[in-house]
Amino acid sequence: MVRHASISRTTKETDIQLQFVIDGEGKAELDTGVPFLTHMLDLFTKHGQFNLTVTAKGDTEVDDHHTTEDIGICLGQALREALGDKKGIKRYGNAFVPMDEALAQVIVDLSNRPHFEFRGEFPSEKVGTFDVELVHEFLWKLALEARMNLHVIVHYGRNTHHMIEAVFKALGRALDEATMIDPRVKGVPSTKGML
């Protein structure tokens, strides 16, 4: 069974088509209109061994906020839909990823209880033209729409690009672990009998 989902979202600010495959090959086809986000999603996809296709048109003449946020919404919805009833999944994932001088950690719980925590500080407000605060917006909307508990810790680093890159790689690896099917798990991984 292929775990996948397709999401379409059209507002006055953005028009997004997104396809997501959990059990993929690390292949990304991305046209986000936000070059730095495209780069980060490519890393996320490769290191999570997902397949991700995104076509997005947004009001980037204003800034990248709406497009970045709405892609986070769509990816979260796609992850939730692709997981289905979550039977047999590991549920939890944890990954440390270094990128040169930077070290990031991402912990996820596919619990159906949305929560987002972020610890760490980026030294720069921008990477190129990309507003660094949008990393938080993207991750929060992803967690909210996927209905997952997401904790992100940037332990240290000096280069903001490296730090964010480590976060997105760790996110891919943590979600890869959490979405894996564990043959020992019978039903849903919760003593409640549901997630």
Swiss-Prot record:
One Gene Ontology cellular component annotation held by this UniProt entry: cytoplasm
MF annotations from Gene Ontology: imidazoleglycerol-phosphate dehydratase activity
Enzyme Commission numbers on file: 4.2.1.19
Isomerase recorded as keyword: no
Enzyme class: lyase
InterPro entries: IGPD_sf (IPR038494), ImidazoleglycerolP_deHydtase (IPR000807), ImidazoleglycerP_deHydtase_CS (IPR020565), Ribosomal_Su5_D2-typ_SF (IPR020568)
Superkingdom as given in the UniProt entry: Bacteria
Residues of the signal peptide: none
Listed name of the protein: Imidazoleglycerol-phosphate dehydratase
The organism of origin for this protein: Geobacillus sp. (strain WCH70)
